[in-house]
Regions:
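Conserved small/polar residues in nucleotide/adenosyl-binding loops
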Residues: 300-307
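Membrane-cytosol interface motif
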Residues: 46-62
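Transmembrane-cytosolic junction motif
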Residues: 31-48
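Ferredoxin-reductase
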Residues: 147-273
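Short, strongly hydrophobic alpha-helical membrane anchors
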Residues: 1-12
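A short, basic/flexible loop-to-alpha-helix module at the beginning of a structural domain
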Residues: 282-294
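Iron-sulfur (Fe-S) cluster-binding segments and ferredoxin-like electron-carrier domains
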Residues: 67-76, 87-137
Length: 308
């Protein structure tokens, strides 16, 4: 058998040639993508016509939900814009593109025919003509101050924030607010004030090992909670929030499973009087018709809608 040995210099030249060809192909593909992006993807600002009454200019590329929030128009989005709650509905009359499969599970055929879309799933790529409910235009966002955050049950907080001076949120029973949750890393033992839990509830927390929990949130999101105070107290917002712990490990193991606790409840339980938090509202259209004489039966799942 004959073995052909290539000179070392020839082998090095072959390797260098291969690397050079690979880099050349990579650069060529990058150049093609950049050219395609320049001519096929809209860049710069676009105009959004809202209810044929107002036109705003906004950068392209983001979701319609985020773009509207940047323009101080806050649409309901209990899931934080992930497309799972189906609440951020708007009519996109022009410029929204095709309805996505993630939207069809939340919209009926009639709604799709009437141009309803989920704002979190619509990308702002060109000028848009949209229609939103008037109630959405009345929603405001405030930097509120925590004035109380005490436990009223073993795992439930009464969370109260004060709106800025002179501000008032006009809400009705059944309305809800949204709280903006920033990225964080929370150690329950370090970051939750045990004095705000109270001596009567601390033994249960220690028994079940809640102070061993940790929670990490990597992106800004929002969560929705019903108001638990009376509408006349519109200069403050009261929420009742239950801590959302991970499920327990299957017996005979003890302790919690290695998953994140609730992001919003962990954040709220870590807040202390004097802390600042972003709240928006009021949202919701499920209200009692007080002018009706018809008998109604109300079922509720927590004290919040009852108390408000």
């Amino acid at each position: 058998m004959t073995h052909i040995l290539l000179p070392l210099s020839l082998m090095s030249a072959t390797i260098l040639a291969g690397v050079g060809i690979f880099l050349l192909i990579t650069l060529l593909l990058v150049a093609i993508l950049l050219v395609a992006k320049r001519y096929l993807v809209h860049s710069g600002n676009v105009e959004i016509n809202i209810n044929s009454q107002r036109t705003v200019e906004a950068p392209s590329g983001g979701s319609l939900l985020g773009t509207m929030a940047a323009c101080d128009i806050f649409l309901p989005s209990a899931c934080g814009g992930k497309g799972s709650c189906g609440q951020c509905r708007v009519q996109v009359l022009d410029g929204g593109g095709e309805v996505l499969p993630t939207e069809t599970v939340h919209l009926s055929r009639r709604q799709i025919a009437d141009h309803w879309r989920l704002a979190c799933q619509v990308k702002v790529r060109q000028n848009l003509d949209i229609h939103v409910d008037q109630s959405a235009l009345d929603v405001k966002e405030w930097e509120c101050t925590v004035i109380s955050n005490r436990n009223v049950a073993t795992f439930i907080k009464e969370f109260i924030v004060q709106l800025p001076a002179g501000e008032h949120m006009n809400f009705r029973p059944g309305s809800y607010a949204q709280i903006k949750i920033p990225p964080f890393s929370i150690d329950y033992d370090r970051d939750i004030d045990k004095s705000l839990i109270g001596p009567e509830y601390l033994p249960a927390w220690e028994k079940f090992g809640l102070f061993s929990l940790k929670c990490v949130n990597t992106e800004t999101t929002v969560r929705a909670y019903s108001m638990a105070n009376y509408p006349d107290e519109g200069d403050r917002i009261m929420l009742t929030v239950r801590i959302a712990t991970p499920p327990f490990k299957p017996k005979p193991a003890v302790g919690f499973q290695d998953v994140n606790p609730g992001i919003a409840s962990s954040y709220i339980f870590s807040l202390k009087p004097g802390d600042k938090v972003l709240m928006s509202g009021p949202y919701g259209d499920f209200h009692v018709d007080t002018d009706s004489k018809a008998e109604i039966c109300l079922l509720y799942t927590s004290p919040s809608p009852r108390d408000s």
